[in-house]
Amino acid sequence: MEQLGFEGMPRRLYPCTPTRLATWLDCPRRYRMTYLDRPSPPKGPPWGHNSLGASVHNALAGWWRLPLAQRTTAAAGALVDRGWINEGFADETQSVRQRERAIAMVEAYVSLLDPADEPLGVERTVATRTDVIAVSGRIDRLDARPPEPDPAEPGPAEPGPAESGPAESHPAGYGSATAAATELVVVDYKTGRHLLSTDDARGSMALALYALAAGRVLRRPCHRVELHHLPSGQILAWSHTDESLARQLGRAEGIAAECATADEQYRGGLPADRYDEVFPPRLGPGCGWCDYRRHCPEGTAASTPRRPWDGL
C-alpha cells in the first residue's frame, strides 16, 4: 500500500558536518562512496601528509591537557615523538626525517605560547541547528580574547585589526585566552606545504560554521577565525561580521539541501545505472589524491597517480 505524506510537513533536519558538505562540493561520486555506499569501497594506502598532520594535531591537543607545570617546549616535542603515526612514508629514513620536522614545527609553535593561557576548548565539538540543518564539528582550539578594537573609536597609535574585514597575518604565538575575555576565537591548525592567505580564512565555510556554533553554544560573540600554519609560523586571520557568517550559513544550507535530495534518491533504491546522474564525478587536480581513485575510471584517466608521500 502506498504511504501517503502530509503536505506542508517540515522536512527533517539534515545532519551534517562541514567535511561532509565540502566532500559533496568537491566530488559527488566521492561523497557517495564515502557516506552512502555500504560497504564502502576499499580506500587506497594512507597518506604521509595526513599522518604528519594527525601527529601534530594530537600532540598540540595533548600539550594543552598536560598539567600547567609540564607544558614545556620539550614536552610538546616528546608528544609528537611518542604519538608519531608511521604510515604513508617511502621508508623509515623518510619517516624519521618527517618526524624530526614535525617535532621542530611543534616546538617552535608552542615556544611562543603562554602555557597559562588556557583555551576554552581543545578538540571541542560544537553543534547548532537551523530550520534546514543540524551541523556539528570539532574545533582544534577555541580561545577567548578581549574584543578587537572598534576602528571607529579613538585608540592607541597602533590599533589592532578591525572587527570586520581583512585581518593581518601574525607570527605564531599571537595571543590566546585571558580571564577577562568576552569574545571567542576559532583556531584551526594547518600543516600543509602550501602557503595560505587571509582569503583562506575568510572563505572557509567550516571555520564560519564553527564560529556560529561556538557562539550559540557558549552564548558569547564569535566572529574571528584563524588558520595557524605551523610550517611557516604564520597566523592567517579573518574577523567575520554577522552578515558574512549568515552568508556562509546560507551557503551551507543550500549544499545540505542538495545532499539531502541525493541521499533520499540513493536510499530510495536509486538504480546503479543512474548513480552518475545523481552523483557525477567532478574531475580536477584533486583526483590524483582521491582515496577512491582506483574505483573511478574517469578520475584515473584524468589524473596522475600520487605516491603516498608526495604531499609532504
Regions found by a protein language model. Name each.
Residues 1-312:
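RecB-family 4Fe-4S metal-dependent nuclease core
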